[in-house]
């Protein structure tokens, strides 16, 4: 069952401007070390970070809170699976909110898709509740 849906559209040039004005202070406030390491290896750092910004915004909307209720930017981290597929790792208040909205007997899965076409970066997040594996075969 779908627990939450969120989307966000971010202007890459806006993020580039913030990076130019605030540099590492902005980077450290919003992004995890893993996200920053990935962006540092990419040709277009601003586009990479703009997609992650959009993903965090979209995830906060899917959680039903926005960036409120104690959820911070770093509580939501975009990771990439081996094949490059993005996924979202939640910690802190974001993880607590996810646990609170997940029905008993289910586990949450956060689906993430990212795209960019200059000057826009977009993210879409769907939070799904899946039956626990132990109960999947019972009816």
From Swiss-Prot:
A GO CC term attached to the entry: cytoplasm
Catalytic activity as recorded in UniProt: apo-[ACP] + CoA = holo-[ACP] + adenosine 3',5'-bisphosphate + H(+)
Gene3D superfamilies the record matches: 4'-phosphopantetheinyl transferase domain
Domain of life: Bacteria
EC primary class: transferase
A biological process from GO: fatty acid biosynthetic process
Pfam families: ACPS
The protein, known as: Holo-[acyl-carrier-protein] synthase
Gene name in the database record: acpS
């Amino acid at each position: 069952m779908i627990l939450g849906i969120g989307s966000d559209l971010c202007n890459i040039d806006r993020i580039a401007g913030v990076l130019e004005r605030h540099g590492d202070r902005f980077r450290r406030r919003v992004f995890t070390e893993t996200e920053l390491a990935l962006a540092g290896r990419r040709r277009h750092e601003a586009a990479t970070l703009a997609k992650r910004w959009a993903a965090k915004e979209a995830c906060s909307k899917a959680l039903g809170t926005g960036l409120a209720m104690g959820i911070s930017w770093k509580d939501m981290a975009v990771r990439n699976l081996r094949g490059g597929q993005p996924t979202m790792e939640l910690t802190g208040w974001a993880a607590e909110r996810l646990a609170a909205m997940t029905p008993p007997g289910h586990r949450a899965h956060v689906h993430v898709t990212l795209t960019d076409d200059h000057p826009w970066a977009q993210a879409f997040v769907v939070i799904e509740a899946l039956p626990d594996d132990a109960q999947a075969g019972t009816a």
